[in-house]
């Protein structure tokens, strides 16, 4: 199948074909997700949570993101690989933000970067786009701002915040973003923003009218069982499968039924 590009996802919006995105953090999972048909693989700073056990995404460093992205890029043949810029890599001087994005593209072989926020990051987005780096925006619940919000509750329920989100979506589009993630906002607002933009929207907890959907792969596969938000659908219970399989292995080792004659030299 042909490789997915930023142009591909734009065409998918125009043709009304929903975009399927998932997070990936390593070679093995990226290879499987790519083969399964995921259009976009997001190397998310959520690796801090599901791979490293942190409570927030803030501890993730740029070097760590580049490492995970390198692993993912080596595992794909088709999917578009988008890499989160972590907290501290773009919030300051726009030149530093551009340098961070350049490192991700050069060292990881990524196809695009993603960053959170609206008006405050527009200049950084413009610098990246001018340099030829595709940028995905992220509005609504932005996990890197959790200590500012104080909660992971739904964002933009009140009209003032909804108006700000509408304006920020337009700002990101005008700055050159090729797509924008809408996280944990009312479905009606997400549908309105999606209709108002010429670029694709990717929803997570934002209803079914966005141009695509993204989930943390560990959540979709039933590996993060201590985190069960309303917007997640479990497509497997791999936690149970893995526990059962390893339990069987341990049992076979204990009773010396593994290895058997066929598994020995």
Swiss-Prot record:
Keywords: Cytoplasm, Magnesium, Metal-binding, Pantothenate biosynthesis, Transferase
Principal subcellular localization: cytoplasm
Record InterPro entries: Pantoate_hydroxy_MeTrfase (IPR003700), Pyrv/PenolPyrv_kinase-like_dom (IPR015813), Pyrv_kinase-like_dom_sf (IPR040442)
Catalyzed chemical reaction(s): 3-methyl-2-oxobutanoate + (6R)-5,10-methylene-5,6,7,8-tetrahydrofolate + H2O = 2-dehydropantoate + (6S)-5,6,7,8-tetrahydrofolate
Pathways per UniProt: Cofactor biosynthesis; (R)-pantothenate biosynthesis; (R)-pantoate from 3-methyl-2-oxobutanoate: step 1/2
Active site per database record: 183 (proton acceptor)
Co-factor note (free text): Binds 1 Mg(2+) ion per subunit.
Pfam families with a match to the protein in the record: Pantoate_transf
Binding-site list for Mg(2+): 45, 84, 116
Principal EC category: transferase
Listed PANTHER family: 3-METHYL-2-OXOBUTANOATE HYDROXYMETHYLTRANSFERASE (PTHR20881:SF0)
Name listed for the protein in its UniProt record: 3-methyl-2-oxobutanoate hydroxymethyltransferase
